[in-house]
């Protein structure tokens, strides 16, 4: 039996780039049925990054907007996920631990299933609390390996990082190529065999 491949739809920069098109919630809700009808997405990114700021610029209620955007996907059995900047939460600058913890409770209440956490420095100390907070809120914790190319950032480096995150309780591991410089061959090696399989051996 062949391995089933599931696709996740991620909207890059849709809400955080002032120079690009940013949608209102009524436009998002309108396009949701088309995304569902495609029948190929198991997950859809519904919030995170600068989503709330854009809502406010349009005079929308961020809390209401996220609930409206996640609702059609949940009804179709599609999971929703968000971006989380570890120490910064959903913001661009560090936030106190209690505020960061509250982010997860609010996002879960709004209908978000998965938190995709990353730290640009790959500092596990910044990611670890996110794993705990996500689980406490009833969310799936997906942790990212921020990919780059250097003598230090080897396959062993990323495999070791993934194993540490799994040990801390990460439910899933994500490869995040923020700068677009990850090499295809290297990315393949990060997954063969998977860190979770290596942990078992």
Region spans (language model):
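A structural motif
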Residues: 40-41, 112-114, 170
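Conserved, mostly hydrophobic/aromatic
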Residues: 14, 117, 173
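Catalytic domains of carbohydrate-active enzymes, especially glycoside hydrolases
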Residues: 30-47, 109
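Conserved small/polar residues in nucleotide/adenosyl-binding loops
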Residues: 190-195, 199
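Generic structural signal for hydrophobic
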Residues: 34-35, 69, 107, 130, ...
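Metallocofactor- and cofactor-centric catalytic cores in central/energy metabolism, strongly enriched
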Residues: 17, 41, 55
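N-terminal small/glycine-rich loop or linker at the start of catalytic domains
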Residues: 2-20, 76-90, 136-149
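Active-site beta->alpha loop and helix N-cap motifs at the rims of alpha/beta catalytic domains
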Residues: 48-129, 146-159
């Amino acid at each position: 039996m062949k391995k089933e491949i599931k696709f996740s739809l991620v909207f890059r920069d849709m809400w955080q780039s002032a120079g690009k098109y940013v949608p209102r919630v009524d436009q998002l809700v309108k396009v949701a049925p088309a995304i569902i009808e495609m029948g190929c997405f198991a997950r859809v990114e519904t919030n995170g990054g600068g989503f709330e700021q854009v809502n406010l610029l349009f005079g929308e209620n961020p809390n209401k907007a996220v609930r409206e955007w996640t609702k059609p996907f949940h009804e179709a059995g599609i999971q929703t996920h968000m971006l989380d900047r570890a120490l910064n939460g959903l913001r661009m600058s560090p936030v106190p631990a209690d505020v960061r913890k509250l982010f997860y409770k609010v996002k879960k209440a709004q209908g978000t299933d998965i938190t995709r956490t990353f730290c640009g420095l790959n500092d596990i100390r910044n990611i670890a609390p996110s794993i705990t907070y996500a689980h406490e809120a009833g969310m799936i914790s997906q942790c990212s390996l921020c990919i780059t190319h250097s003598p230090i950032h080897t396959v062993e480096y990323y495999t070791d990082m993934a194993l540490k995150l799994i040990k801390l309780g990460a439910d899933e591991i994500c490869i995040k190529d923020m700068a677009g410089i990850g090499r295809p061959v290297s990315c393949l090696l990060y997954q063969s065999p998977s860190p979770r399989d290596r942990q078992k051996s």
